[in-house]
Design a protein with these regions (language model features):
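Hydrophobic beta-strand residues in large extracellular and virion-surface proteins
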Residues: 39, 50-52, 93-95, 126-128
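Sterically constrained small-residue positions within well-ordered secondary structures
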Residues: 28, 41-43, 84, 117-119
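Beta-sheet-dominated interaction scaffolds and their linkers
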Residues: 2-38, 156-173
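Asparagine-centered strand-capping/turn motif at beta-strand->loop junctions
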Residues: 27, 33, 38-61
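Intrinsically disordered, low-complexity Pro/Gly/Ser/Thr-rich segments with frequent PxxP/GP/PP motifs
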Residues: 58-116
């Protein structure tokens, strides 16, 4: 990895699949979609600390209620951004040598009002960079971005049989 790289686009959603006014068949479901990034550190000697800069121009990213998690050892640890503005939200993660971590960014579905409103739609792109560009500036990393989503049926509060999707994203390196 160079000191900084664009990885992929992202789209975070809590939205109806079909707009209610157009749902003449009554098939409308709500999708909750998050962004998942697997990061493998292929280096045998050193951990790498990265900054993940999520950039969104048309939507105020800091005004959206989001959750971020980092998982290397089976514990989804809640992350807070190290920087947040209207157009950027930056997280910092460390991947041990020869290990893989999973970063998750999703709408805050722990807040029922977010799911009930079904009005979250945030798009942008991710730029990764070394947290400290001094010292070793060349790391062999494997980045695998994807979207994962859950479809909630109508009346989801009483009938929790959902379907899920997983889609790999094109990445730039």
């Amino acid at each position: 990895m160079a000191i900084s790289s664009v990885v992929s686009n992202f789209e975070l959603l809590v939205k109806p699949l079909v707009q209610p006014s157009a749902d003449i068949l009554g098939a409308g479901r709500t999708i909750i979609q998050g962004y998942f990034l697997s990061i493998s550190n292929l280096n045998s000697n050193s951990a790498v600390t990265l900054r993940l800069n999520f950039r969104a121009q048309t939507s105020n990213i800091s005004a959206n209620s989001l959750l971020a998690f980092w998982d290397v050892n089976g514990n989804n640890s809640l992350l807070n951004p190290v920087f947040s503005s209207a157009t950027n939200q930056i997280y910092q993660v460390t991947v041990p040598a020869r290990d893989t971590g999973l970063f998750i960014l999703q709408p805050n579905v722990a807040e029922p009002k977010i799911v009930d409103a079904a009005n979250t739609e945030l798009r942008g792109y991710l730029v990764t960079s070394l947290a400290s560009p001094f010292g070793t500036t060349k790391y062999n990393l494997l980045l695998s971005p994807e979207h994962r989503g859950t479809f909630l049926p109508r009346g989801y509060r009483t009938h929790l049989r959902s379907q899920e999707l997983r889609a790999s994203l094109l990445s730039i390196s």
